[in-house]
Amino acid sequence: QTCLLGVGSICCLAACSAKNMSDESTMKEQTKTEQVSSQTATKGQAVADFELTGVDGKTYRLSDYKGKKVYLKFWASWCSICLASLPDTDEIAKDAGDDYVVLTVVSPGHKGEQAEADFKNWYKGLDYKNFPVLIDPSGKLLESYGVRSYPTQAFIDKEGKLVKTQPGFMDKDMILKTLKEMG
């Protein structure tokens, strides 16, 4: 009976170790595709760099755009206002030139957004070619910018400082005006 108890204990420990190793490899994999600081973005302060993978499979880092203004749009597939404003977002991105860049972010599994695979499959049916859609699977970027509703916009200046975070709808003219006023 003691022998049986010992064998049972060893089996349990082995199973727990395998589970932990599996969790560790999953976390390492997530770290490769997503590096986001939990630092809160504060107006007038430098924002933390992030690294996210886009729906297109490319890696995007905020630091790659140093010297350019960044229009960062957080949105969701279920948000009708977000969907209605995507054509304007696409047009703004198309006209960006060297002055600014447009990045959009979705957070699968957070705030009602569908799972990542479902989102990517759904997004394939849309035809927006001028802006990347970055995937924030942990929701950390969403959190760091204080996103409580969709859409939410963040404007980052050429030095990487947060100029403004604006929840709710902004039309094309308001977005372009904000970018222009950033200098």
Which residue ranges define each predicted feature?
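A short beta-strand-turn-helix
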Residues: 49-70, 94
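Short, internal strand/loop/helix patches
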Residues: 119-156
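Thiol-/selenol-based redox modules, centered on thioredoxin-like
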Residues: 158-183
